[in-house]
Amino acid sequence: MTPLSSPLSQYWQTIVERLPEGFTETSLSVQAKSVLTFSDFALDSVIAHPEWLAELESASPQADEWRHYAGWLQEALAGVCDDASLMRELRFFRRRIMVRIAWAQTLSLVDDETILQQLSHLAETLIVGARDWLYAACCREWGTPCNPQGVPQPLLILGMGKLGGGELNFSSDIDLIFAWPEHGETRGGRRELDNAQFFTRLGQRLIKALDQPTMDGFVYRVDMRLRPFGDSGPLVLSFAALEDYYQEQGRDWERYAMVKARLMGDNDDAWSRELRAMLRPFVFRRYIDFSVIQSLRNMKGMIAREVRRRGLKDNIKLGAGGIREIEFIVQVFQLIRGGREPSLQSRSLLPTLDAIAALHLLPENDVAQLRVAYLFLRRLENLLQSINDEQTQTLPADDLNRARLAWGMKAENWPQLVGELTDHMANVRRVFNELIGDDEADTPQEEERSEPWREVWQDALQEDDSTPVLAHLADEDRRQVLTLIADFRKELDKRPIGPRGRQVLDQLMPHLLADVCSREDAAVTLSRITPLLAGIVTRTTYLELLSEFPGALKHLIMLCAASPMIASQLARYPLLLDELLDPGTLYQPTATDAYRDELRQYLLRVPEEDEEQQLEALRQFKQAQLLRIAAADIAGTLPVMKVSDHLTWLAEAMIDAVVQQAWTQMVARYGQPAHLDERQGRGFAVVGYGKLGGWELGYSSDLDLIFLHDCPMDVMTNGEREIDGRQFYLRLAQRIMHLFSTRTSSGILYEVDARLRPSGAAGMLVTSADAFADYQQHEAWTWEHQALVRARVVYGDPQLTSQFDTVRRTIMTTARDGKTLQTEVREMREKMRAHLGNKHRDRFDIKADEGGITDIEFIAQYLVLRYAHEKPKLTRWSDNVRILELLAQNGIMDEHEAQALTVAYTTLRDELHHLALQELPGHVAQTCFSKERALVQASWRKWLVAV
């Protein structure tokens, strides 16, 4: 065993006085001194439990002792009588065994592969032990869940990721998916439950037993987000529901996750075999699947973006050449060829590497280097985490922990360890890049083209000197370009740019200037790009991105030239530069029905319990998607209707995620309202009004929302901190508003306006469905019924959605006096015009002035409220374009008039989108859109001016 280094020997002297009673420096073995000096976790544990230290000193941990874990745990749980004592024993057992593993790992008593195996078996033992105890307890309370034939149904648990692969790290969380075989009911209990209810309750208790922090700590952080539909899906699914999901909706990234999926516990029964057989075709295709390569390229981009986004410079998992890249390399071959090559279907990485070598899919030397690098990195990761039982992969900055890791990795000192680490990660990165490929470097022609601009940039040439390269520009533009360059250089002198940053900037600027100054609008484009560059000059990684990826630089120039809004966004949030790397996604926004899934995948990389990171991730996702929508808009690949569709679907995905987060936080604090025990869903709905309700969001639109619940009076929550059920929903809505409006370094998510709720700002933030119906029928003004025309549920369970739709339909199909309605709608419009109309007589406000968008909206709303009692089909849609279509189809409006209003409406909205991209207000010269305005005004007079 390597003797302790000098810094660690000195640190040992500070430990001696903290040793448990009965232990002295002379009574301890060299091994004990080494472990207790290395790991604060082990030291704190044996101080609390001195008998563990005596046990370890008398008999060292063995390589195969994982075989005894199940028996040891069974003994520990023999006297458990309730959930609280179960939680205590699970935590006690986990800590005791983790100390044994830390001891064996620190002293290299067993090899590193065995350590991974022991960590994984420990987690599996605790999961299965807790499940089995709780299953029996739930059966005593509610009966045994059975299928219609009376066959008992088990809870099957899929361990995902490193747990499934038998490669768990020291302080890992665990990713699980719960399933049960067949529908039915419980039998033999005090009350019958549907199987779905039984297994949901069992799953909730199991997560609590493992995950909830107590005075004894926790067992594992449990992450359930890999299940179908993530947090918005059921906690536990039947086999049939799982099969439907993976056949119909399973995504590529879910295939990757399922490669490592493994059933926990004794899993050779008929149900387990059925589940494995069902999942196998989804994961491994029968043919050689080269379609996966593009998805893997996207994954590679995600890795790079995450490293930049989180500043993971010294991260041995996510950094370049880290553990994630080795896993990625192996998965490439598993997913492309695994269906044809059974040897590639292993859940574990090292056996799969052996199969890759045997199949000659990678050179033998590459495989050998990957294996050595993987074991080196995994040992370093585990040692790092075992210091404080902390989930981290970032190398320490303090001398003590650096000395610990150098000693644990058998290096002479920290620089030697860093050198070895750098070599291993460089080998991994080389194979990684060769497998997927990077952008092509600059061609000699591009280098030659940029050379004159090197002088302009580095030598600060005067106007006369630079005339040849700027000859195509007008005199004023040429002077402006040179002034911008000179001002930018002066600005740089005020910034603390290091040598590396200056070097990269000097490499980048000639190429950037060559591209920008070849344009006729060079001065305008450069004026938009230099603020962005000034913002990132101290963040070398972004300069390197633009320097090393010429394609990204070209897209940056094109987008900034086209839109100051995009330039401003990129300057404010430089992490968006990552989106420029892949033109395939930059100009092709996410499919309208895929935003929720993309966001779910994005959020999986963020710890569920880290609220700050969750808030940042939501905002960053929205900004990236907005950039892609705007880029497609500028490129002309999205018409105005589709721009709004994408912006609306994006907003709905954000609402879904925010409600999920708020719900999770509230339930963790208070439990859920007890009436939900008897029904599916959450008894909560979010209704979108205005542009959101009408599928007409713009780039900077706020969200008009109201919140509904269906909680009866006198219902309490079922958590340890009980509160009134209606108070729960009020706090939930307040939490949702907070998550939307909190300003982080990435800004706010959306401005939210909830004043359209019953009684406006004076009313309760969240309303019961019954109270909402009563208000609409007896108290609401006509303008509130107009608003209801453009309202729809954007988040909610089917039961509440149906209730809202019924109320909306009832209100809209109520017979009204035509003259009274006409007068009230017209007077409301006149009030709005007086309040919001354009104050500049020489300008036309596209939205608020006569003949503008609001007039078209009022015409549509008036006609729905006027005629829906005769033509109920008019209530079907909430957007103006389809309402106009319905009016024509139902004989209310002439088809030619409806079509003309639709064209006018989309034309005006298109102009608003483009003004937003130019960061211009929503008004134009009075001479613009005269044809459209005249048409709208004629229609207004026809329908809303009293005859």
UniProtKB/Swiss-Prot annotation:
KW Transferase (keyword) present: yes
Documented EC number(s): 2.7.7.89, 2.7.7.42
UniProt entry tagged with the keyword ATP-binding: yes
Positions of the UniProt region annotated as Adenylyl transferase: 450-947
Annotated spans, Adenylyl removase: 1-440
Function: Involved in the regulation of glutamine synthetase GlnA, a key enzyme in the process to assimilate ammonia. When cellular nitrogen levels are high, the C-terminal adenylyl transferase (AT) inactivates GlnA by covalent transfer of an adenylyl group from ATP to specific tyrosine residue of GlnA, thus reducing its activity. Conversely, when nitrogen levels are low, the N-terminal adenylyl removase (AR) activates GlnA by removing the adenylyl group by phosphorolysis, increasing its activity.
Name of the protein: Bifunctional glutamine synthetase adenylyltransferase/adenylyl-removing enzyme
Source organism of this protein record: Salmonella enteritidis PT4 (strain P125109)
Lineage: Bacteria, Pseudomonadati, Pseudomonadota, Gammaproteobacteria, Enterobacterales
